[in-house]
Amino acid sequence: MGETVTIQKNWQELIRPNKLQVTPGSDPARFATIVAEPLERGFGQTLGNALRRILLSSLQGAAVQSVHIDGVLHEFSSIAGVREDVTDIVLNIKDISIKMQGEGPKRMVVKKQGPGVVTAGDIQTVGDVVVLNPDLQICTLDEGAEIRMEFTVATGKGYVPAERNRPEDAPIGLIPVDSLYSPVRKVSYKVENTREGQILDYDKLTMTIETNGAISPDDSVAYAARILQDQLNVFVNFEEPRKEVAQEIIPDLAFNPAFLKKVDELELSVRSANCLKNDNIVYIGDLVQKSEAEMLRTPNFGRKSLNEIKEVLAQMGLHLGMEVPGWPPENIDELAKRFEDHY
C-alpha cells in the first residue's frame, strides 16, 4: 500500500494546467495564441520545445510533388511569352498551400492563355483537393502566350526535397518540386512566471501558431500533444496502480451516475472543450440537458464541435436534450468523488 502511494505521488502531486486559453488571431483558421498555466517549474520549456518540434515536423499535410509543363524538358528552360523562367515558376509552385482529405497522389491541371497572370486560383482541382491560397501568383503571360501545367499532389509530413520526389521511372519533362507538407508554418513560444496560490514561480507557456489554413492552430496543438503522448507510452514500463476502494454505502441516485463525470474528462478537441468551459458546462449532467440549438448559440461553437460532442455522448448511450430529474444535486462535488469509479 505504501509503495503504491509513493509511486502515484510521482505524477499526482505535480501541478497541472487548469487554464488553456485560445485567443484567435486576425484569421482564426490560421493564427492563434495558446496559453497553458500553471506548470511545474521547467515544464514550460520542456513542453514548449517538444510541441514546437512536433508541430513543425510531424503533422500530416498535402503538397505538390512534381509538375509537368507542356513543351518543357527540364527546369532550366524558358517558355516563349512567359516572363518568368521555369526555375522561378517551380519556386512559386512550391508555395501553393493545399488541403486534401483523401489519399494521394492526385492530379491538378491549369491551362491559361495570355495576356494575364496565372494564379493558384486558376488551378482545376479534383475531388477533395482545395487550394488555400488562390491569390498566389505562379507566372505572367504576354499577349498570345499559352501555358498548360499538370501537378501531382500527395500527402506526407515535414519537408521533402525535390530529389526524393523524382521517381526512378520519371518521364522526360517531369520536374520534381520541394514539398513542404507541414500545415504549420510558424511556431514560437515563451515561458514566463505565473502565480498559483502563494507560489509565484510556476511556469506559464504561451505558444503563437500560424498554419496554412488546412488545420486550425488549436487542433494542430491537440494533434501534436497526441503524437507526443503516443511516443511516450513505450517508456511507461508498469501498470498504473488501481485505487483501493473503501467499502462504503453508495446512495441511490435519481439519475445516471455518468452525469457526475466532468466534461473535461471527455476526449474532446481543444476548441470544443474551451467552448463548454466558457459556457460554464462542468458536468455531463449540465451538457445533456442542452439542446442542439442552445449549443450552437455558444460563442465559437460550430457544427463540427456539435457533431463531435454528439458522437462522444452516443458512445456513452446519452444524447443532447435529455431531462434529468433532481439535477443538479446540492452535494454535487461530494457525489462526483464518491461515484468516480462507477461511471
UniProtKB/Swiss-Prot annotation:
Q: Where is this region: Alpha C-terminal domain (alpha-CTD)?
A: 255-343
Species assigned in the record:
Bradyrhizobium diazoefficiens (strain JCM 10833 / BCRC 13528 / IAM 13628 / NBRC 14792 / USDA 110)
Give disulfide pairs as residue numbers.
none
Q: What note about domains is in the entry? A: The N-terminal domain is essential for RNAP assembly and basal transcription, whereas the C-terminal domain is involved in interaction with transcriptional regulators and with upstream promoter elements.
Matches recorded under Pfam families = RNA_pol_A_bac, RNA_pol_A_CTD, RNA_pol_L
Cite the residue spans of the region called Alpha N-terminal domain (alpha-NTD): 1-239
Q: Report the SMART domains cross-referenced here.
A: RPOLD
Keyword Cell membrane on this protein? no
Q: Which InterPro entries does this UniProt record tie to the protein?
A: DNA-dir_RNA_pol_insert (IPR011262), DNA-dir_RNA_pol_RpoA/D/Rpb3 (IPR011263), DNA-dir_RpoA (IPR011773), RBP11-like (IPR036603), RNAP_asu_C (IPR011260), RNApol_insert_sf (IPR036643)
The cross-references to HAMAP family, in alphabetical order and at most eight, read:
RNApol_bact_RpoA
What is the name listed in the Swiss-Prot or TrEMBL entry for this protein?
DNA-directed RNA polymerase subunit alpha
EC numbers, comma separated: 2.7.7.6
User: What Gene Ontology terms describe what this protein does at the molecular function level?
Assistant: DNA binding; DNA-directed RNA polymerase activity; protein dimerization activity
Q: What does this protein do?
A: DNA-dependent RNA polymerase catalyzes the transcription of DNA into RNA using the four ribonucleoside triphosphates as substrates.
Q: Record's family? A: Belongs to the RNA polymerase alpha chain family.
Q: List the keywords (alphabetical).
A: DNA-directed RNA polymerase, Nucleotidyltransferase, Transcription, Transferase
An example Gene Ontology biological process? DNA-templated transcription
GO cellular component terms attached to this protein's record: cytoplasm; DNA-directed RNA polymerase complex
Q: What reaction does this catalyse?
A: RNA(n) + a ribonucleoside 5'-triphosphate = RNA(n+1) + diphosphate
Q: How does it assemble?
A: Homodimer. The RNAP catalytic core consists of 2 alpha, 1 beta, 1 beta' and 1 omega subunit. When a sigma factor is associated with the core the holoenzyme is formed, which can initiate transcription.
